From Swiss-Prot:
EC number from the UniProt entry: 2.7.1.39
Record's keyword annotation contains Cell membrane: no
Cell location: Cytoplasm
Keywords annotated in UniProt: Amino-acid biosynthesis, ATP-binding, Cytoplasm, Kinase, Nucleotide-binding, Threonine biosynthesis, Transferase
Name of the molecule in the record: Homoserine kinase
Entry function: Catalyzes the ATP-dependent phosphorylation of L-homoserine to L-homoserine phosphate.
Pathway assignment: Amino-acid biosynthesis; L-threonine biosynthesis; L-threonine from L-aspartate: step 4/5
Sample GO molecular function, one term: ATP binding
Stored NCBIfam families: thrB
InterPro entries membership: GHMP_kinase_C_dom, GHMP_kinase_C_sf, GHMP_kinase_N_dom, GHMP_knse_ATP-bd_CS, Homoserine_kinase, Ribosomal_Su5_D2-typ_SF, Ribsml_uS5_D2-typ_fold_subgr
Reaction(s) this enzyme catalyzes, per UniProt: L-homoserine + ATP = O-phospho-L-homoserine + ADP + H(+)
Length: 288
């Protein structure tokens, strides 16, 4: 059996800690035979555990403590600490592992609830489970979210080789915003959501780049954001915004300029991968 979970990009600018989009990069987990102890075979490095302390197995055992150990093989296109939902993908993979081996028959709604409980909010985990674009909120311990089709466009991910921990990126955020600024920030997010629902990527893109919640504070940690925006706009892109906490920048563009824009971004003197991606519509899947 094989479990596949997509990468996700949270925020989309002003949709801070609420919006998330599934992307065509994947964490893939092949379930092998039973074993005496849990073991995840992978060549990712970075201190990611091979035993039951791995987040995937920890999550699975949290849901089904009596699971029989298995040999697992993990491959992952999602680079860690880049703002592409790698930790959320691992949590969702663990939920799918428990659901498959223990035959829990969890609904998608239950999977989102469990994952959001573990991660703290649904902005990454909901699109990882459901696919496409999700707007959500966690209120008084309850998850509220809406899945909707995102407008058709090209996605270009500018992924620096240097990682940025979410804890570091959150550390630069203020404890509070002045009331008038919060009202303006909220109105920008509202217009972005409405524009996306109307398939108006031109207006949505303008709002994406006017975020007041987090990007201006995080820009000191992601100095390449301004440079990428300038290149993207000069080529006709809709917008460029931080993916999650960064340092990845996600560019939204008309499909007919995607290859040209990708080539232009590859010429920047920043050590990074520049990937042409699509919106992932299915979310987490299990293949038998």
């Amino acid at each position: 059996m094989r479990i596949r979970v997509p990468a996700t990009s949270a925020n989309l600018g002003p949709g801070f800690d609420s919006c998330g989009l599934a992307l065509t990069l994947y964490l893939t987990l092949d379930i092998g035979g039973e074993a005496e102890t849990w073991y995840i075979e992978h060549d990712i490095g970075g201190g990611i555990p091979h035993d039951e302390t791995n987040v995937i197995i920890e999550t699975a055992l949290h849901l089904a403590p009596n699971l029989t150990p298995h040999h697992l093989v993990m491959t992952c296109d999602i680079p860690p600490a880049r703002g592409l939902g790698s930790s959320s993908a691992a949590v969702v993979a663990g939920i799918e592992l428990a659901n498959t081996l223990a035959e829990l028959n969890l609904s998608k709604e239950e999977k989102v609830r469990i994952a959001a409980e573990i991660e703290g909010h649904p902005d990454n985990v909901a699109p990882a489970v459901l696919g496409n674009w999700v707007v959500g909120a966690k209120l008084d311990g309850e998850d509220f979210y809406v899945r909707h089709l995102f407008p058709d466009c090209a996605l270009i991910a500018f992924i620096p080789k240097k990682e940025l921990l979410t804890s570091e990126s959150r550390g630069v955020l203020p404890d509070a915003l002045p009331f008038k600024e919060a009202v303006q920030a909220s109105s920008i997010a509202n217009v972005m959501i409405a524009a996306i629902l109307r398939n108006d990527m031109t207006l949505a893109g303008e709002m994406m780049e006017r975020d007041l919640w987090h990007e201006k504070y995080r820009s000191k940690l992601v100095p390449h954001l301004t440079q990428i925006r300038e290149v993207a706009k000069s080529k006709g892109a809709y917008a460029a915004c931080l993916s999650g906490a960064g340092p990845t920048v996600l560019v939204f563009a008309p499909r007919n300029i995607a290859n040209t824009l990708q080539a232009s971004l590859q010429t920047l003197e920043i050590d990074a991968d520049v990937l042409l991606l699509d919106i992932e519509g299915s979310g987490a899947e299990v293949f038998y």
